[in-house]
Amino acid sequence: MSLRLTLLNFVLRAVEKPYLARATDVAALRRQFDRAAERWFIHPEGARYRPYRLGGVKVLEASQGRVDRRRVLIWFHGGGFFQGSPETHRHLGAALSARCGARVILPRYRLTPEHAYPAALEDARACYEALLRAGYDPAHIAFGGDSAGGGLAFSLVLDAHARGLPAPACVVAFCPWTDLTLSSASLRRNARRDVMLPFTRLAEVRDTYLNGADPQDPLVSPARARFPEGPPPALIQASRVEILEDDASAIGARLQAAGGLVRMQFWRRTFHVWQLLQGRLQEADQALDQAGAFLALHLGKTEPEEG
């Protein structure tokens, strides 16, 4: 474990976790996340960002270096379905683009409490359908996301299958929240070890998102779904000391049970979605290197081009 990670773990436990445990003002939480992103997240040199609409949904496209515009990663940002945005995660999109040679599309999906389930999933589907209508080959489209966005990526895999849409080339998920029944053993086992996420707030966040929907619904809790045979290959990264450790393990097991190729990668001392600190934290850069190689492999070979 690097010295910088040790220091970050200390600060998160002393400052961030107590704040998240007591904060109730959604607008204030959003502002705090936005400020943290501006202060702490590093944008790769030469990163390019372009806003537009895709399937009626506002998106931000991130790219860096030489990319092939036919290769696309749709990345769903995390934030418990109530905060976060393409802006808070655009640096991550650019960093992934640099590593896999694809452009990264970050949808501005609707958030709670203004818009409950299934609004986020509807927006995710709209983006994917728009790419398919535009002639993009699903063999060159990947889904990805972190935390709540990671769970949303797997929900979209299930939703696409149910609607007769083709599966994506692969899925990459960082610390995904995949079981909203809140029955994962690690929620309690790692409650004290997790330096950032307070277990005591998850039920409130979950209930606001569901607004009465059944947490057992596979589109809500993909870790409880029966995936169709031969699901897309998946790379799942998580921490051994975060409360969502078992959410990551469970979705991986479900995919493997359906015959899917799954790469599970666990870090021993990292915090929830440490990958956001790319450029500052060597453990984040190592994780993104692994994710980029996985995406490059499964998105297929094409001829890259500038911008």
Where are the predicted features?
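A glycine/proline-hinged amphipathic helix-loop "lid/cap" segment
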Residues: 1-67, 300-307
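Alpha/beta-hydrolase superfamily serine-hydrolase fold, recognizing
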Residues: 50-307
